[in-house]
Structures are given as C-alpha cells and as structure tokens.
C-alpha cells in the first residue's frame, strides 16, 4: 500500500472496529479513508430507525445528537485505522464538541455522508473536524475531541 492507503470497509468490517450495535450503530459503510488524515463514511437513514417513532411522529427528523454520534463513530474508525493498536479491550469516548452547527434537517430516505478530518493527536486525545452532508449540502458540522481508553480503566 502507498502513503494514501485508500480502502472501502463494509458493515462486517465496521462491526469488527466499533463496539456499537443496533440500534446505535450509525455507520453503514466506509467509502474512503487515509490513515492519520481523513475518512468518508455513509449512514443510510430509513423510516425504520427507532428514533423516528418519537422525533417527530408527523414530521420525522433525525435528531441532531445522533448526527453527531454518526460523525463520532466515523471518527472512531479513522482513529482505529490510524494506529497500530488493537481495538481489543479499547473504547473510543467523546470528551467534547465545539462549534456544533445544524444546517439542514435529515429525513428518512436521506443518505448521510460523513466526513471527518484529523486535526491533531496527542497521547490518548484525538481532535477532529466532522461534517455531515445530504445530497452535497452541509447538514451538520462540529469539532470533536475523543479519547481512546482501556475498558478495564473505566
């Protein structure tokens, strides 16, 4: 592989990288990533999502906090693919979000494209810029900070 190792990850591979499971796994596919730099992933939003039962029954809109979680999960995959460390016994935890903006509602049937770019990494902390798009239009954005922790230290 060259310096810009481009790959595609399907749901089976994602399940091996993230601890999340239904109904909280919010990344369906990774379209592209460059270790230590960036990732592009997808969440296909369907009317079958459990959160649409109450948010909102007559006008279903994906909750903004779940858009942020989808970005965080994409960022978690980027972190895992950017280190030589095994994911066994590790958790990727949000430690902060800044400059959060919701620009466009996300509806059932939308394909949420998740872009994360690594800004910096120091010890166990990772800072990323995340942007979520629907049909090429910015739906949400944030700067996110996360930590990689050992499960036994929790």
From Swiss-Prot:
User: A Gene Ontology biological process annotation?
Assistant: lipid A biosynthetic process
Q: What is the organism field in this record?
A: Oleidesulfovibrio alaskensis (strain ATCC BAA-1058 / DSM 17464 / G20)
- What name does the UniProt record give this protein? 3-hydroxyacyl-[acyl-carrier-protein] dehydratase FabZ
Q: Which HAMAP family match?
A: FabZ
Q: List the InterPro entries hit by this protein, alphabetically.
A: FabA_FabZ (IPR013114), FabZ (IPR010084), HotDog_dom_sf (IPR029069)
* EC number, as in UniProt: 4.2.1.59
Per the UniProt record, the lineage of the source organism begins with: Bacteria, Pseudomonadati, Thermodesulfobacteriota, Desulfovibrionia, Desulfovibrionales
Report which superkingdom the organism of origin falls in.
Answer: Bacteria
Q: Specify where it is mainly localized.
A: cytoplasm
Assigned GO CC terms: cytoplasm; membrane
Localisation: Cytoplasm
Which positions are catalytic residues? 55
Job description of the protein: Involved in unsaturated fatty acids biosynthesis. Catalyzes the dehydration of short chain beta-hydroxyacyl-ACPs and long chain saturated and unsaturated beta-hydroxyacyl-ACPs.
Q: What class of enzyme is it?
A: lyase
Record GO terms (molecular function): (3R)-hydroxyacyl-[acyl-carrier-protein] dehydratase activity
Q: Does the keyword Cytoplasm apply?
A: yes
């Amino acid at each position: 592989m060259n310096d810009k190792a481009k790959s595609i990850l399907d749901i089976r591979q994602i399940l091996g990288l993230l601890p999340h499971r239904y109904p909280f796994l919010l990344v369906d596919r990774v379209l592209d990533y460059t270790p230590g730099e960036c990732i592009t992933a997808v969440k296909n939003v369907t009317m079958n999502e459990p959160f649409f039962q109450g948010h909102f029954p007559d006008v279903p809109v994906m909750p903004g906090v779940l858009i942020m979680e989808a970005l965080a999960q994409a960022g978690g995959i980027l972190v895992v693919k950017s280190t030589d460390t095994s994911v066994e016994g590790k958790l990727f935890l949000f430690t902060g979000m800044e400059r959060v903006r919701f620009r466009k509602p996300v509806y059932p049937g939308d394909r949420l494209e998740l872009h994360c770019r690594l800004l910096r990494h120091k010890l166990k902390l990772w800072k990323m810029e995340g942007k979520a798009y629907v049909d090429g239009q910015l739906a949400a954005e944030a700067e996110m900070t996360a930590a990689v922790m050992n499960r036994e230290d929790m």
